[in-house]
UniProtKB/Swiss-Prot annotation:
Family membership: Belongs to the GRP transporter (TC 2.A.7.5) family.
InterPro entries, A to Z: Sugar_transport
Protein name according to UniProt: Putative sugar uptake protein
Topology versus the membrane: Multi-pass membrane protein
Pfam families the UniProt entry points to: Sugar_transport
Residues spanning the membrane: 10-29, 46-63, 73-92, 104-123, 133-152
Length: 176
């Protein structure tokens, strides 16, 4: 799409790497059935998924579609993310979130995301959108291991094997 893969070998290895990474990410989210948690997917959920996917595609492709430096793109993208969040809250019916203390404490996570987003924009300009996406997916490794060690998320048996296999696949895909 962005002309980053010049040869057929680049294309084959690139597609394979993306597929391997996606399979790895899916494997890290594996949970065994019977944990007592079920959730019905509604049309509203699917609509939000489609809209957020379209927003993410626009966000991820913006560094290659315009000829501006990372600093000048950062504020418009940040405002777009903020607007998207406000629209999501307005349509989800959770207007009380604007008054909750927890929402404002989440600003720290937002600042962390902002730093990561800025790094992504720079990486996309320097390395290309595809490579920046792949490098960004390596954060799944950090968050998964951090969740298991720092936050005490428990994974045993098949879940642990699937998670570790998924992390290995992400690394293999990133190396490709």
């Amino acid at each position: 799409i962005f002309g980053e893969w010049k040869t057929s070998n680049n294309f084959i290895f690139g597609i394979x790497a993306l597929v391997i990474i996606m399979v790895g990410v899916i494997x890290t989210x594996y949970t065994e059935k019977g944990d007592g948690f079920t959730q019905k997917t509604t049309n509203k959920d699917i609509l939000f998924l489609v809209l957020t996917t379209x927003g993410y595609l626009a966000y991820x492709a913006x560094p290659k579609t315009i000829t501006a430096d990372a600093e000048s793109m950062f504020l418009p993208q940040t405002l777009g993310i903020l607007l998207g969040s406000v629209i999501y809250l307005a349509f989800s019916g959770n207007k009380a979130a604007f008054k909750e203390k927890a929402s404002y404490l989440d600003l720290f996570a937002g600042i962390s995301f902002g730093i990561a987003a800025y790094a992504y924009i720079i990486x996309a300009q320097v390395n290309g959108v595809t490579n920046a996406f792949i490098y960004g997916q390596l954060s799944v490794i950090i968050s998964t291991i951090g969740g298991m060690t720092l936050l005490g998320e428990r994974k045993q048996g098949k879940e642990l094997v699937a998670t570790l296999a998924g992390l290995c696949l992400i690394v293999v895909g990133a190396i490709l």
